[in-house]
């Protein structure tokens, strides 16, 4: 199974129609159905939907994984674990992960901190109309430009030392400075080389609101 879309909520109009599997998270299940897309797996505690909506979800979903509200995982974390358990080699794109509650937003950014999701770090991306977020483990990586985006930022997680080569604003031993987020960098008609000695790297492609 190649590509999985997980809709966590938010704007569903950006959702491509060519994913192999569609997973709805809580209220995101209804947005999938509203777009006429299949609801292959419904995941969540469903505390944000009415009883009528929950009956609709149960009727139309091919599989329902309902959790209790009091749990260690967020609904999105649970959805990712369910998806990778069923399709361990899939590439997963998460839509609707950047809006809503700030605590959920931060949890979504740091998904690979969960040891159950860490093995799939390079298979997860988070997307909305203005941003695309991917992850890389410690080591050396070549980062390709995204033609749809204007900027790229790098956030090392885990107190690792980051080096950036081939970008408009390089970062190396001679000019090193410590920041939580190295934002607003740009490509120079070539891939960017990054290296991180420990932890993992959050890479954020972005563009200005148009």
Task: State where each predicted segment sits.
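Short coil/turn segments at beta-strand junctions that form active-site/ligand-binding loops
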Residues: 1-2, 20, 88-91, 122
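N-terminal beta-strand-loop-alpha-helix module at the start
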Residues: 1-57
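General beta-strand structural signal in soluble alpha/beta enzymes
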Residues: 7, 23-25, 66, 125-128
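Anionic-ligand-binding alpha/beta catalytic cores of soluble enzymes and soluble regulatory domains
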Residues: 91-139
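Long, charged alpha-helical interface segments
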Residues: 129-131, 136-210
């Amino acid at each position: 199974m190649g590509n999985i879309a997980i809709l966590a909520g938010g704007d569903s109009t950006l959702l491509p129609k060519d994913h192999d599997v569609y997973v709805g998270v809580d209220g995101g299940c209804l947005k999938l159905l509203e777009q006429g897309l299949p609801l292959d797996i419904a995941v969540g505690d469903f505390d944000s939907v009415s009883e009528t909506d929950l009956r609709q979800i149960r009727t139309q979903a091919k599989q329902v994984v309902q959790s209790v509200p009091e749990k260690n995982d967020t609904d999105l974390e649970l959805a990712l674990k369910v998806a990778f358990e069923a399709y361990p080699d899939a590439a997963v794109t998460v839509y609707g992960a950047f809006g809503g509650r700030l605590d959920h937003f931060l949890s979504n950014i740091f998904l690979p901190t969960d040891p159950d999701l860490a093995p799939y770090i390079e298979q997860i991306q988070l997307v909305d109309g203005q941003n695309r977020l991917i992850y890389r483990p410690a080591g050396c990586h070549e980062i390709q430009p995204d033609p749809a985006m204007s900027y790229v930022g790098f956030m090392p997680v885990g107190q690792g030392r980051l080096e950036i080569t081939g970008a408009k604003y390089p970062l190396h031993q001679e000019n090193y400075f410590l920041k939580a987020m190295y934002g607003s960098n740009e490509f120079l008609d070539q891939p960017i080389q990054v290296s991180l000695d420990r932890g993992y790297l959050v890479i954020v492609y972005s563009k200005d609101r148009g």
